[in-house]
């Protein structure tokens, strides 16, 4: 596995979006808390409070695509992981039950929902080489970082 530290040039601005169903205004930050993966030879960046994913084949030129509406698009600190033929996605919704989603096609979907049982912040899935799956979460000066083994 390789890691890169690269000042990727993507928009970082605030967006104001109106939810037409309940007449509320949402503010979205672009590029905060990024999670980047390489899936099938293409790079993807997911960020907090965002409606989109940035996509690149060379880590230099980036295009932005809107994600499906059923994803937690207003969540914080998205966690995106590749395991086999699937990409797993979730984002923090403290105080609310958080679900994971998986897909074989990030841009077009469909996304299969994996129902969660509790709320968390700053999630992180870990797929171990021995086939076990672990889930880590936590971000607080008052609470520890938590970990549990998941049924795979």
What residues fall within each predicted segment?
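Carbohydrate-active catalytic/glycan-binding domains of CAZyme proteins
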Residues: 1-152
């Amino acid at each position: 596995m390789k890691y890169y530290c690269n000042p990727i040039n993507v928009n970082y601005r605030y967006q104001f979006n109106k939810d037409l169903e309940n007449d509320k205004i949402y503010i979205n930050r672009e590029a905060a808390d990024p999670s980047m993966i390489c899936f099938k030879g293409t790079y993807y960046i997911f960020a907090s409070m965002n409606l989109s994913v940035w996509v690149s084949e060379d880590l230099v030129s980036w295009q932005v695509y809107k994600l499906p509406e059923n994803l937690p698009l207003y969540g914080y600190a998205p966690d995106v992981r590749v395991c086999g033929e699937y990409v797993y996605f979730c984002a923090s919704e403290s105080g609310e039950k958080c679900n994971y989603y998986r897909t074989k096609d990030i841009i077009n979907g469909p996304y299969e929902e994996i129902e969660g049982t509790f709320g968390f912040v700053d999630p992180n899935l870990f797929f171990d080489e021995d086939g076990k799956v672990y889930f880590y979460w936590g971000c607080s000066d008052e609470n520890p970082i938590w970990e549990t083994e998941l049924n795979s």
